[in-house]
C-alpha cells in the first residue's frame, strides 16, 4: 500500500471487475422495476396518503377549492368533500 492509503480499493478497479457487474446487472434493473411498479400500481399514493390525480376535485367542480379560514382549513375541506 502507498503512504496515506486508506486500504480501500480504487474506484476504477471496482467498476472494471466482473463481480461488480454481475451484482449490479441484477440489482439496478430490479430497483428501477420496483420503483416503477410502486408508482404505476398506485401503492405510492396509498403509502404516502396523497390523493390520486383523479381525486383532487369532485366531478362537479372545475377549479380548486379556496379555503377562507386559515385555522379551519381542514374542516372546510372535509365539509366540501362530503
Swiss-Prot record:
Keywords: Electron transport, Heme, Iron, Membrane, Metal-binding, Photosynthesis, Photosystem II, Thylakoid, Transmembrane, Transmembrane helix, Transport. Heme binds at residue 24. GO terms for molecular function: electron transfer activity; heme binding; iron ion binding. It is a single-pass membrane protein. Pfam families: Cytochrom_B559, Cytochrom_B559a. SUPFAM superfamilies: Cytochrome b559 subunits. With its partner (PsbF) binds heme. PSII binds additional chlorophylls, carotenoids and specific lipids. GO terms for biological process: photosynthetic electron transport chain. The chain crosses the membrane at residues 22-36. It comes from the Bacteria. It is found in: Cellular thylakoid membrane. InterPro entries: PSII_cyt_b559_asu, PSII_cyt_b559_asu_sf, PSII_cyt_b559_N, PSII_cytb559_asu_lum. Signal peptide: none annotated. Its cofactor is heme b. One of its GO terms (cellular component) is photosystem II. NCBIfam families: cyt_b559_alpha. Belongs to the PsbE/PsbF family. This b-type cytochrome is tightly associated with the reaction center of photosystem II (PSII). PSII is a light-driven water:plastoquinone oxidoreductase that uses light energy to abstract electrons from H(2)O, generating O(2) and a proton gradient subsequently used for ATP formation. It consists of a core antenna complex that captures photons, and an electron transfer chain that converts photonic excitation into a charge separation. Heterodimer of an alpha subunit and a beta subunit. PSII is composed of 1 copy each of membrane proteins PsbA, PsbB, PsbC, PsbD, PsbE, PsbF, PsbH, PsbI, PsbJ, PsbK, PsbL, PsbM, PsbT, PsbX, PsbY, PsbZ, Psb30/Ycf12, peripheral proteins PsbO, CyanoQ (PsbQ), PsbU, PsbV and a large number of cofactors. It forms dimeric complexes. This is Cytochrome b559 subunit alpha. It comes from Synechococcus sp. (strain CC9605).
Amino acid at each position: 500500500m502507498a503512504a496515506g492509503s486508506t486500504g480501500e480499493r480504487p474506484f476504477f478497479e471496482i467498476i472494471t471487475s466482473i463481480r461488480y457487474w454481475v451484482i449490479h446487472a441484477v440489482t439496478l434493473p430490479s430497483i428501477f422495476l420496483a420503483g416503477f411498479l410502486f408508482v404505476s400500481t398506485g401503492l405510492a399514493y396509498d403509502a404516502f396518503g396523497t390523493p390520486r390525480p383523479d381525486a383532487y376535485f369532485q366531478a362537479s367542480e372545475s377549479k380548486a377549492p379556496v379555503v377562507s379560514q386559515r385555522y379551519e382549513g381542514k374542516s372546510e375541506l372535509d365539509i366540501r368533500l362530503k
